[in-house]
Amino acid sequence: MSLQPCRPAPALILAHETPAHATQIEALLTRAFGPGRFSKVSERVREFADFAPELSFCALEAGQVVGVVRMWRVSVGDQPIVFLGPLAVEETERKHGLGAQLVEHACAAAQAAGEAAVALVGDVAFFARVGFAIAPDVSMPGPVDPKRVLARTFADVPLTGAVRAA
Ligand SMILES: CC(C)(COP(=O)(O)OP(=O)(O)OC[C@H]1O[C@@H](n2cnc3c(N)ncnc32)[C@H](O)[C@@H]1OP(=O)(O)O)[C@@H](O)C(=O)NCCC(=O)NCCS
């Protein structure tokens, strides 16, 4: 049996998104979430939240966007926090840890920036792996299963109240 030379896999880079990535990110989000994407309660949050590009990242492989995580500034009650989402990884790249890596990277950036907490709407089975737990006292601007409202705190702050504009 002869061994075939193979090309080294292109390195994965986590970088802040730029306007040049916008088209690829939109296409990835449409593939990942399908047509129901804009009916999610998280979209209602993003309508009033302030995008935080310095806390948001995309994963690039050979210049192609293969993952994205976006972060937004909001408040819960009077507490300023960060809202995470959308998070998506290209289907061919899943189950290699990239989703968790993107969340960790964005959370580390938020913590380094002095943010007290990150909240999101998602599956606890996935996000518990990266430090999130159900946030029972946080309410969303629309109907949602309360078991999907999650938070990860970096400080001992009360997370009680509605998610609203920062
Ligand atoms: C969720 C997502 C970002 C994970 O990306 P990823 O790169 O595969 O993540 P990781 O490799 O870090 O983790 C994969 C593990 O999470 C599990 N997982 C993925 N989505 C999950 C979910 N919704 N609920 C529970 N577990 C989930 C996978 O089965 C896998 O489990 P395993 O390690 O036991 O095989 C990716 O599946 C995706 O883009 N999904 C579509 C968009 C989406 O649902 N985004 C999250 C919205 S809140």
Indicate residue ranges for each PLM-predicted region:
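A conserved beta-turn-beta hairpin within the catalytic core of GNAT-like acetyltransferases
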Residues: 74-84, 94
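C-terminal "cap" of GNAT-fold acetyltransferases
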Residues: 140-166
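Conserved acetyl-CoA-binding loop-helix of GNAT-fold acetyltransferases
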Residues: 89, 95-108, 120
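A short beta-loop-alpha structural element at the N-terminal edge
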Residues: 12-25
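Short, low-complexity, intrinsically disordered N-terminal peptides in bacterial proteins
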Residues: 1-13
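Hydrophobic adenine-recognition pocket in adenosine-nucleotide-binding enzymes
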Residues: 17, 87-89
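Conserved active-site alpha-helix within GNAT-family acetyltransferase domains
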Residues: 112-116, 121-146
